[in-house]
Amino acid sequence: MKKHISFPSIEQFKNIIANVNRKHNFIGLDENGDAIYDPTKPKPKLKFKGTVKLHGTNFGVSYNAIDGLWAQSRENIITPEKDNSGSAFFVETHKTAFLILMGQIADTHKIDVKTNTITIYGEWAGKGIQKSVAIANIDKAMFIFGVKITPHPKHEEDKTPAYWVDSSFLRSPEDRIFNIEDYPQYEIEIDFNYPQLSQNKIIEMTIAVEDECPVGKAFGFEGIGEGIVFSHMTEDGEVYRFKSKGEKHSKASKVSTLKPVDDAKINNIIETVNKVTPDWRLEQMLDKTFDIMNGGKIEIKRMGEFIRNVVNDVLKEESDTIATAGLEPKDINAKVSERCRNYFFVKQNEEVGLK
């Protein structure tokens, strides 16, 4: 039976920061089956590949040996009779090309199409689909940007997660099936310990695409672009994706855009916080809060009290250091609190023998 296999919503940068932190902080489940997180674990540095985000409509083509080939929009299975901007009709009239692509995926990634569904995702873009962008001037075409493999479980309890595979080799330009990776790409390494330090570079690349769409230019049309989709694929086929869009293409609706940050100030804050919160100060305030020297125990419900003690001691003893750095207490309080929380959890874990 044909099923709609949805393409996930592309997140904002802030959501990806939260997702990466949650995954890398996860250490297991407790006796009640609830997740346990360790916020002190170092965050990863991940390389993200950026491709041009086209302003069209989401388009998927699925295949397995049992149900054959079918087309889908973001929300529904579609047919030439109930279409989405002509994309289902395009599949119907280019079946041979899509079946060849499905065969290439199955061969390259060793996919059994009797027990798995392959879905090719792309943007259906061109004349009559969207307006005010360079790509709106070309004849309609599909631009592939991803391939997902969905296993078929024999029983519901045997269900295994879908996963993503490389799609960079897929294209059939003579059939107007292109690959977004054949156009200019962008790369950035994001340190998730300090993700905001990547923000300005992301904005810079996005503005370049917004000012002149590289894909539209490749087809001979000048005009604005929508933005960039950044993605990182893990070894187990999970993909982190986030979008960065400009405002020029959307005159009516409000677009969520990244705001520039002061890299020098952020680095200054990090350096100053490290200077004013040495381990000995945190240890002193931990003892003051919990009376550890006399047998007191660390309690999570009093973590806020510990943080306040550290903040107050820093303001009392390090005001000159903060002022010399050209900062105010409000500039560093959030980072001081973060440093305190990390230290607190390290000491709590040591107390119960986890480290």
Please report, for each region that a protein language model flagged, where it lies by residue.
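Core nucleotide-handling region used for phosphoryl-transfer chemistry
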Residues: 1-355
